[in-house]
Amino acid sequence: MNDNQTVIDLDLQIAVEGFELPSQAELELWVKTALRDTMSEAELTIRIVDVEESQELNSTYRGKDKPTNVLSFPFEAPPGIELPLLGDLVICAAVVKQEAMDQNKPLIAHWAHMVVHGCLHLLGYDHIDDSEAEEMESLETHLIESLGYINPYKEQ
């Protein structure tokens, strides 16, 4: 499947003000890149939030009482039902900005990385153990570099 054939229905929710955010077109490109060769169509929500909402969701769903860069909530259809609904990503603008500065990375490249990373989680990838982490990071690096950005795991 050619990634240009992937149809994306992206519901973008912006629940934060005062940050430089990527455009809907950029977000859609990054989602299409992450879904390359996996789905012909996909529906997902990306919600960009503040520190408080990120921390509340991270505490509720992961037991970690701090904000985080991206949370992924995959949609699980009942058995036998095929739907293009992928799930939801919640991205904290303040954390992404701070991480980009701390890691000396261009903000736009870090946004791309967070969207690709979150989409891979929606597809079932994880980084709980070393072998899973290695597989996921390798795929992330390939996808991010295909977008023209540098390896997100390379020290700056």
Curated annotation (Swiss-Prot):
Name of the featured protein: Endoribonuclease YbeY
Domain of life: Bacteria
Keyword Oxidoreductase: no
Cofactor binding notes: Binds 1 zinc ion.
Enzyme Commission number, as recorded: 3.1.-.-
UniProt similarity note: Belongs to the endoribonuclease YbeY family.
Cofactor dependency: Zn(2+)
Keyword Nuclease carried by entry: yes
Keywords recorded for this protein, A-Z: Cytoplasm, Endonuclease, Hydrolase, Metal-binding, Nuclease, Ribosome biogenesis, rRNA processing, Zinc
Binding site for Zn(2+): 117, 121, 127
Annotated TM spans: none
Gene Ontology BP term (one): rRNA processing
Gene (name only): ybeY
Protein task: Single strand-specific metallo-endoribonuclease involved in late-stage 70S ribosome quality control and in maturation of the 3' terminus of the 16S rRNA.
Record localization: Cytoplasm
One Pfam family hit: YbeY
Database matches in InterPro entries: MetalPrtase_cat_dom_sf_prd (IPR023091), YbeY (IPR002036), YbeY_CS (IPR020549)
GO-annotated molecular function: metalloendopeptidase activity; RNA endonuclease activity; zinc ion binding
GO cellular-component term (any): cytoplasm
Main location: cytoplasm
